[in-house]
C-alpha cells in the first residue's frame, strides 16, 4: 500500500518518446500520474540524426532503430552525469507501470550492493534468479543468471551511466549490451516480480538483431562473469535451482557490506522468506 507517497521527493526519472508519437506520450503521462512518478520527457533520437558527441559511437552495423534507441539511452546517461544524479529511472514510452513501482525502486536502491550499475524493472526471462534482498513480501531484489532482454524500464546509477558512456564503437543494440554485462563490466540486478511491463497493443520495433551470434563463446564469458560477481557457491545454487530466487551464499555475504532498507544488512534481508 502506498501511504503519503506524494509528500516525498520524487526520484529522478526520464522517459523516451519520439516527437511524433503524441498518443504514446499521452498514455505515458497517464501511467506516470497513476504511479505518482514525475518524469522528464526526453525526445527520442532518430537513428539518422545522432548528435555530434555520439557520432563516433556508431557505424553502419546497426539499423536506424537500434542506433536511435541506444543513442536515446546514452543521452539520458549523459544527463545523469551532468546533473550529478546518484541514479535515475529510465522508461520507454511503451511501459506499463504498477502503482507501487516508485516504492519498490526506493527500497531496491537501498538494498543493492555497493557499486551496482543497473536495476531492471522489466523481466522477460524464465532463467533462475539469485535473491539479494527482500523489498516486501512476494517481491525481491535479484541477480540474474542470464540478464533478460528489453530496456522498457531501468534504473541506472551514476557508475552505470559512466560505463554505458565508455568511448567505443557500439556493435550491439543497447539491450544486448546490458544482456552481455561482461563487455562493460556492468553490475546488473532486477526487481522480481517486475513492477514494469510492456503495454499490450503497442507496436514495438525490436532491438534484437537477426544476425548470428557466437553462442558458445558467450556462454563461457557469461559463466566466468557470473562466478566472479556471485561467487562459485551462489552461481551453482542458482544454476541448478528453479525459478524462485535462490538466497545468497556465505561467499557473497562475506564480500557485501551494504546496508539495506530499515537498517537491515544485505545478509539479513537476503535470508528472509520469499513469499512462501
Identify the residue ranges that each predicted region occupies:
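An acidic/histidine-cluster motif and surrounding catalytic segment
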Residues: 1-91, 95-276
Amino acid at each position: 500500500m502506498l501511504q503519503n507517497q506524494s509528500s516525498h521527493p520524487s526520484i529522478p526519472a526520464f522517459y523516451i518518446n519520439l516527437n511524433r508519437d503524441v498518443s504514446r506520450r499521452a498514455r505515458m503521462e497517464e501511467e506516470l500520474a497513476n504511479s505518482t512518478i514525475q518524469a522528464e520527457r526526453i525526445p527520442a533520437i532518430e537513428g539518422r540524426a545522432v548528435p555530434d558527441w555520439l557520432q563516433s559511437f556508431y557505424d553502419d552495423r546497426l539499423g536506424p532503430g537500434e542506433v536511435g534507441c541506444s543513442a536515446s539511452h546514452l543521452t539520458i546517461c549523459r544527463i545523469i552525469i551532468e546533473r550529478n544524479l546518484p541514479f535515475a529511472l529510465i522508461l520507454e514510452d511503451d511501459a506499463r507501470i504498477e502503482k507501487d513501482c516508485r516504492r519498490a525502486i526506493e527500497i531496491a536502491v537501498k538494498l543493492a550492493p555497493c557499486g551496482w550499475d543497473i536495476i531492471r524493472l522489466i523481466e522477460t526471462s524464465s532463467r533462475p534468479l539469485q535473491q539479494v534482498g527482500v523489498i516486501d513480501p512476494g517481491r525481491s531484489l535479484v541477480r540474474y543468471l542470464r540478464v533478460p532482454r528489453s530496456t522498457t524500464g531501468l534504473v541506472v546509477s551514476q557508475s552505470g551511466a559512466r560505463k554505458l558512456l565508455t568511448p567505443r564503437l557500439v556493435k550491439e543494440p543497447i539491450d544486448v549490451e546490458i544482456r552481455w554485462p561482461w563487455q562493460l563490466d556492468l553490475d546488473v540486478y532486477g526487481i522480481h516480480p517486475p513492477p514494469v511491463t510492456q503495454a499490450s497493443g503497442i507496436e514495438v520495433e525490436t532491438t534484437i538483431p537477426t544476425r548470428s551470434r557466437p553462442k558458445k563463446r558467450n556462454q563461457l564469458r557469461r559463466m566466468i562473469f557470473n562466478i566472479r560477481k556471485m561467487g562459485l557457491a551462489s552461481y551453482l545454487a542458482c544454476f541448478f535451482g528453479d525459478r524462485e530466487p535462490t538466497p545468497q551464499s556465505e561467499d557473497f555475504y562475506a564480500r557485501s557490506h551494504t546496508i539495506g532498507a530499515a537498517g537491515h544488512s544485505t545478509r539479513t534481508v537476503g535470508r528472509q522468506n520469499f513469499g512462501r
